[in-house]
Every structure is written in C-alpha cells, then in structure tokens.
C-alpha cells in the first residue's frame, strides 16, 4: 500500500502545473483574486508576503500537503506524526507562534475521536515545555478556531506572550498583537526558534512517546469494549 501511495503521489506531482504567485509588502496590497481561485499566502518571498493563486476549493491545510514545495522553510513542520502537525503559523511572523493542525478535516474539536484529542493535548503540553525550556517563552495563550467554512480545519494555536506575566485573554487584542510583527525583522528568529524546538522534540523522542500513548489509549478502549461485551453476555 505504501508503494502504491508513493507511486500515486509521484504521478500527482508530475501532473501538477506550477502555480503563479504574487509578492506584496502588505496583505491589503493583494489585487482581487481571479474567478474560481483563491490566495494561499505566507509571509516571506521577495517582499513581505507571497500569495499562491490556487483553486478556490482547496483548503490551506490541503494546499500544504499537496504542494509542499511551495511551503517556505520557516513554515515546515517542527513535529509531524500520525496525523498531527506542528509548525510556525504561516500567516503571522510572530516568533514562537505555533499552530497545531490535522491532516484529516474536522469542523470542531468535539468531533475528534477521543484518542486524537488526548494526543493533541499531550503534544500541546510537550511543545509548550520546549517553548519554555528552549525558547524562554514562559506564557502563551491557547486558542482554538472553529468555522462553518468548509475549507477550514479545526486547529489550535499557542500564542506567545512577552514578559513574565500574561495579560488576560479577554483584554488581549490577538490580531493587533500578531500584526505588529514584520516578516523582514523576524524571519531569522523564527528559523532559530523552529530549529531549537524541533531539536528539543526530537531529543525527548516525542514521536516515541506519542506512539506509546496512542497504543495505551487504544488498549484501554479495547479493554473497555471487551468488558461491556462480557457484561452483556452474562446478563
């Protein structure tokens, strides 16, 4: 199956046409998008932002999976295992601002299966540990995003907060804060943070811990099902 998937991906890659892109200094400088298309933009490029012109029915997550060659180095995953992906957020160049996404589409986090949600929580915790130990980020707001938009997948963010104390989330203008960071001033720091965090997660062997947790959770779930079936059989 793996070989078939690899062959299929190669065929898909060969059929794909190169995408056009537009570079601008400010996001509001992007011209109107062509009919039937949408912009998938990242910070970086020859100016501050680069937008690829992609089919309107593709989500950002699907774009990054299907067109990995267009994902900038600073937005490559720092952790990826069994459907959960951690990377620097591609829209705002805030060092230490990480997004936790999924390779399957869910509209809301309560629709996740229990095992995936518990793994999500564990990976969030371990990533935050790395941010504290390796990046000196003591506090971060944990945010979730759910939309009815069919091309938006549920995800979580860790938004770093400067200083030794964190402002109350209700008093915190997240968009204003994130928009204050300029790509040309932050790219080197983002790359450094990514390197440090990726090395930390590799050093603690998070993939192994993640897989062990998954096996335990599945084992517990199967044990519960078996007990229920036995109890019903004895009635």
Residue ranges of predicted features:
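Short secondary-structure junctions
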Residues: 81-82, 131-139
């Amino acid at each position: 199956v793996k070989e078939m998937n690899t062959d299929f991906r190669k065929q898909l890659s060969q059929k794909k046409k190169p995408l056009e892109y537009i570079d601008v200094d400010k996001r509001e400088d992007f011209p109107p998008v062509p009919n039937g298309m949408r912009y998938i933009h990242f910070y970086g490029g020859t100016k501050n932002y680069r937008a690829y012109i992609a089919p309107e029915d593709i989500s950002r997550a699907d774009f990054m999976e299907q067109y990995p060659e267009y994902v900038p180095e600073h937005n490559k995953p720092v952790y990826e295992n069994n459907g959960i992906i951690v990377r620097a957020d591609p829209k705002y160049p805030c060092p230490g601002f990480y997004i936790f996404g999924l390779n399957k589409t869910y509209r809301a986090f309560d629709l996740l299966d229990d095992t995936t949600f518990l793994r999500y929580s564990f990976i969030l915790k371990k990533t935050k540990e790395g941010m504290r130990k390796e990046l000196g980020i003591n506090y971060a707001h944990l945010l979730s995003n759910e939309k009815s938009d069919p091309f938006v997948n549920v995800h979580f963010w860790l938004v770093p907060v400067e200083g030794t104390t964190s402002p109350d989330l209700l008093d915190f203008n997240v968009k204003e804060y994130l928009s204050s960071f300029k790509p040309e001033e932050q790219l080197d720091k983002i790359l450094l943070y990514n390197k440090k965090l990726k090395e930390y997660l590799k050093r603690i062997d998070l993939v192994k811990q993640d897989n062990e947790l998954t096996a335990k959770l599945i084992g517990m779930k199967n044990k519960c099902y078996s007990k229920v079936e036995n109890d019903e059989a004895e009635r």
